[in-house]
Regions:
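Generic N-terminal amphipathic, Lys/Arg-enriched alpha-helix
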Residues: 1-22
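Short, well-structured alpha-helical segments
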Residues: 26-37
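Intrinsic-disorder/low-complexity recognition with aromatic hotspots
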Residues: 46-50
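Active-site cofactor/substrate anionic-group-binding motifs, chiefly glycine-
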Residues: 51-99
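A generic, well-ordered mixed alpha/beta core segment in the N-terminal half of proteins
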Residues: 81-167
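Phosphate/diphosphate-binding glycine-rich loops and adjacent basic-rich segments that engage nucleotide
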Residues: 147-218
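Extended, non-catalytic structural segments that build the interaction scaffolds
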Residues: 217-229
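Conserved small/polar residues in nucleotide/adenosyl-binding loops
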Residues: 232-240
Length: 240
């Protein structure tokens, strides 16, 4: 496979063009491109450009609505609810973090729940936006079954990423962003596309045997981080 290197601003313009061809508005295409390019720049390649085809395919299959009518409902001065109308996840997340920041600035706390959305990349990208406003931030989401309970080889839990961010007193904030699995699925997909091996102990094949083959891992299951120790964390509810 031939590798092509592009400067971030050039790549961003191309990504915007692609998203617009798939029906996104200029604004939504730019928001989505910014998130993908950020992932590349921070080294989270499994959540970067390698995901572009996935989003485009989901638009084509009508899983993602390129022209959503997003509704924001005010529950209280601090709490808001967003119905994203199956928008691309980046747009829903962008609206949500901005609303949370706005609510927090008014009352001291901002809580925002989002429904009818999809994959939005790195939670840390959004947490950092709030941290730059001097806010402590927590972001939670869930996903389809991909992780097996400790001692099993059938998926039951989502990777259910958790993210925490806080100002650090320096220019570099503290951001913790992790799925509750040994490795996120984006990294497995990236390894598969680039013929890379996985670390041992992060996934099982479909027969329940440990594998370092990314293709076999995609057909199998991911393992919970810290094994039995964090298995209990996976059982915690992530939605009401």
């Amino acid at each position: 496979m031939e590798k092509v290197k592009l400067k971030a601003p050039i790549l961003k313009k191309e990504v915007i063009k692609i998203f617009k061809k798939y029906g996104l508005s200029q604004d939504h295409a730019k928001i989505s491109a910014n998130a993908l390019i950020n992932a590349e720049l921070v080294g989270a390649f499994g959540h970067g450009i390698s995901r572009l085809k996935m989003y485009c395919d989901r638009i084509s299959k009508k899983v993602i609505n390129p022209k959503p009518k997003i509704k924001i409902k005010k529950i209280s001065q601090s709490i808001s609810h967003i119905d994203a109308d199956n928008s691309i996840g980046f747009v829903a997340a962008d609206i949500a973090i901005k609303k949370a920041i706005s609510n927090a600035k008014k009352t001291g706390i901002g809580l925002v729940a989002v429904r009818n959305s999809g994959h939005y990349g790195l939670s840390g990208y959004y947490a950092e936006q709030a941290v730059k406003k001097n806010l402590v931030t927590m972001i939670y989401t869930n996903g389809p079954p991909a992780v097996a309970p400790h001692g099993a080889f059938k998926s039951l839990f989502g990777t259910n990423p958790v993210c925490f961010g806080t100002p650090s007193g320096s220019k570099i904030p503290f951001i913790f962003d992790s799925s509750i699995s040994m490795i996120n699925r984006g990294k497995i997909r990236f390894a598969s596309k680039n013929n890379q091996k996985l670390p041992l102990g992060v996934a099982l094949d479909k027969f329940g045997k440990p594998t370092i083959d990314a293709n076999k891992a995609l057909k199998g299951v991911q393992l919970p981080i810290a094994g039995s120790v964090s298995y209990t964390h996976l059982t915690l509810p992530t939605k009401a």
